[in-house]
């Protein structure tokens, strides 16, 4: 490809609203251009990277015998209403009506559509296990699209779905997909951690995220140094090392605690450690009033709480509801005589506490010396707390380390979440109707590209991994009016183009402009044709090298083969 004919509008400076380094690089390098908030055009350079990433995915899906197909972008609302996700998905869904008033949506994901097709076309256990996938543009009406391709309203995604007759088949499909995803990310050059994750609105109870460590990441993952434990902070577990020595139960005493609206203020006012305080927070779970208890030095993890309550709508009670239900404002709520609560759930940190401080059910008042069972009851204990960095992990008891990261993939064991609702049944070996068992698998392809850039930035540009680099070799000719340089450049272009993607900079530009653009292209091998061309000597540089190295043509062949294979 001749650079003089290649559309690559580079910029010296990134737009002021670009925050993420990957966003800046992709704008400056002429990879993408914004059309509107959260929507981007992929220019030739960016589209080459995208297609190479898609090619890796296609190859790895072929390797596990998963065929590709294509679903429509425009979906009928009735399918999502049938699954129950039409309202649950919320404002992120692009909804529209046609001229006849029929409701439709732009697909943010395709579980319902695949399930409907399977329900109509898969009838026997003999047709399973089966898996399908597509690579397609998705649409989500993000409230705050930002960071370029990391959080957009339109993005390219691999979404795959598996269909099984037994749990054993699903487990094997899940493992096959997980292994394929690891290979995809490795080939794309992005470092990832597979972590325990929340399934969110996707449904199902078992899922794994693939998180790419990056400073701009919006997620936090908890890992140990051995790599034997990794979880999204939303689901991370840790060992609570605090132990209170047993005490004789003291008399329950009501005390005034004016203006103590935080645990810190309350602890200072009563001269007790936060571990002597039990926080009480009222949640509304569907129509149930649930009082949630946790030790004062810990924080409630609402994702974990959601799994315990298993309700469609869970939210903390507002000030008005709190006063009406409990008779107290926030801080005074407590578990003693809490007959108004439909259920009391406590974090495991509340076990083994003696003579603690709890809300007295009245604004600005607390009970001292409250004891479990004597003064209040708990219906259920569960791990509903947020893990803290440095706490021991639950596997090897090593300190947890927190890292910001980008979610680039997510795989789910959906089970029968969709198939039961949508009537996707098959006949088993005994001729009995059973719901198909599903899995769901996704990679944010355009998001993955941003993650690659974040992990492979250089001082001047980017160092693309060879399998997704827009060009593997970049030939840069210094003087276009020098015949010896042109002759050598064209010779190398012809030779290397037989095996590699080659960009030949044949522009009549200054050396500084050419080198600056080459840094933004980030080809694994840059070959500069300069004043020693007549002697068969070129300069070779990788994006991460400080300086170029002179080589003969014979040495160049060996170097290219070593770098690119």
Curated annotation (Swiss-Prot):
Record has Cell wall biogenesis/degradation as a keyword: no
GO terms under biological process: prolyl-tRNA aminoacylation
Entry's family note: Belongs to the class-II aminoacyl-tRNA synthetase family. ProS type 1 subfamily.
Keywords, in A-Z order: Aminoacyl-tRNA synthetase, ATP-binding, Cytoplasm, Ligase, Nucleotide-binding, Protein biosynthesis
Free-text comment on this protein's domains from its UniProt entry: Consists of three domains: the N-terminal catalytic domain, the editing domain and the C-terminal anticodon-binding domain.
Bridged cysteine pairs (disulfide): none
Enzyme class, spelled out: ligase
Enzyme Commission number(s): 6.1.1.15
GO cellular component, as recorded: cytosol
Keyword Ribosomal protein belongs to the record: no
Subunit structure comment from the entry: Homodimer.
InterPro entries from the UniProt entry: aa-tRNA-synt_IIb, aa-tRNA-synth_II, aa-tRNA-synth_II/BPL/LPL, Anticodon-bd, Anticodon-bd_dom_sf, Pro-tRNA-ligase_IIa, Pro-tRNA-synth_IIa_bac-type, Pro-tRNA-Synthase_IIa_type1
One Pfam short name: tRNA-synt_2b
Source superkingdom: Bacteria
Molecular function as annotated in GO: aminoacyl-tRNA deacylase activity; ATP binding; catalytic activity, acting on a protein; proline-tRNA ligase activity; transferase activity
Protein name from the UniProt record: Proline--tRNA ligase
Reaction catalysis annotation: tRNA(Pro) + L-proline + ATP = L-prolyl-tRNA(Pro) + AMP + diphosphate
């Amino acid at each position: 490809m001749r650079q003089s004919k290649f559309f690559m509008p580079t910029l010296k400076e990134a737009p002021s609203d670009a925050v993420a380094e990957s966003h800046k690089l992709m704008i400056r390098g002429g990879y993408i251009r914004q059309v509107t908030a959260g929507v981007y055009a992929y220019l030739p350079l960016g589209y080459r990277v995208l297609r190479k990433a898609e090619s890796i995915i296609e190859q790895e899906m072929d390797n596990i015998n998963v065929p590709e197909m294509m679903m429509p972008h425009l979906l009928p609302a009735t399918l999502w209403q049938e699954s129950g996700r039409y309202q649950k998905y919320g404002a992120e869904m692009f909804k529209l009506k046609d001229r006849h008033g029929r409701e439709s949506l732009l697909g943010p994901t395709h579980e319902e559509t695949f399930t409907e097709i399977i329900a109509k076309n898969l009838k026997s256990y003999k047709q399973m296990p089966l898996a399908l996938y597509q690579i397609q543009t998705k649409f989500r009406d993000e409230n705050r699209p930002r960071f370029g391709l990391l959080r957009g309203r339109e993005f390219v995604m691999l979404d795959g779905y598996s269909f099984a007759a037994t749990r054993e088949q699903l487990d094997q499909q899940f493992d096959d997909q997980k292994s394929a995803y690891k290979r995809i990310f490795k080939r794309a050059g992005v470092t990832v951690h597979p972590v325990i994750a929340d399934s969110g609105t996707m449904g199902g109870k078992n899922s794994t995220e693939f998180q790419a460590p990056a400073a701009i990441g919006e997620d936090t993952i908890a890992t140990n140094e051995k790599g034997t434990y990794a979880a999204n902070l939303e689901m991370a577990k840790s060992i609570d090392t605090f132990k209170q020595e047993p005490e004789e139960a003291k008399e329950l005493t009501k005390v005034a605690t004016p203006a103590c609206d935080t645990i810190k203020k309350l602890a200072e006012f009563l001269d007790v450690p936060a571990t002597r305080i039990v926080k009480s927070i009222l949640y509304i779970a569907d129509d149930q009033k649930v009082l949630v208890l946790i030790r004062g030095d810990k924080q409630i993890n609402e994702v974990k709480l959601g799994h315990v309550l298993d309700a469609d709508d869970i939210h903390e009670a507002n000030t008005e509801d709190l006063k009406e239900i409990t008779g107290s404002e926030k801080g005074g709520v407590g578990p003693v005589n809490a007959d108004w609560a439909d259920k009391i759930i406590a974090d495991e940190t509340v076990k083994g506490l003696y003579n603690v401080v709890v809300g007295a059910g009245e604004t600005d008042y607390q009970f001292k010396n409250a004891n479990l069972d004597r003064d209040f009851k708990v219906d259920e204990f569960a791990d509903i707390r947020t893990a803290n960095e440095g706490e021991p992990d639950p596997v090897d008891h090593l300190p947890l380390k927190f890292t910001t990261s980008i979610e680039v993939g997510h795989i789910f064991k959906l089970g029968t979440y969709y198939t039961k609702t949508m009537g996707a049944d098959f006949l088993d070996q005994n001729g009995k109707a059973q719901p198909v068992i599903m899995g769901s698998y996704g990679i944010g392809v355009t998001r993955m590209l941003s993650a690659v850039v974040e992990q492979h930035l250089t001082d001047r540009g980017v160092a693309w991994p060879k399998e997704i680099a827009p060009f593997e070799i970049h030939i840069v000719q210094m003087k276009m009016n020098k015949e010896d340089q042109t002759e050598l450049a064209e010779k190398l272009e012809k030779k290397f183009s037989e095996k590699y993607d080659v960009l030949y900079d044949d522009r009549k530009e200054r050396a500084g402009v050419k080198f600056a653009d080459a840094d933004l292209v980030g080809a694994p091998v840059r070959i500069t044709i300069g004043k020693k061309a007549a002697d068969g000597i070129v300069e070779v540089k990788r994006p991460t090298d400080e300086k170029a190295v002179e080589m003969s043509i014979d040495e160049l062949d060996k170097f290219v083969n070593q770098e690119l294979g």
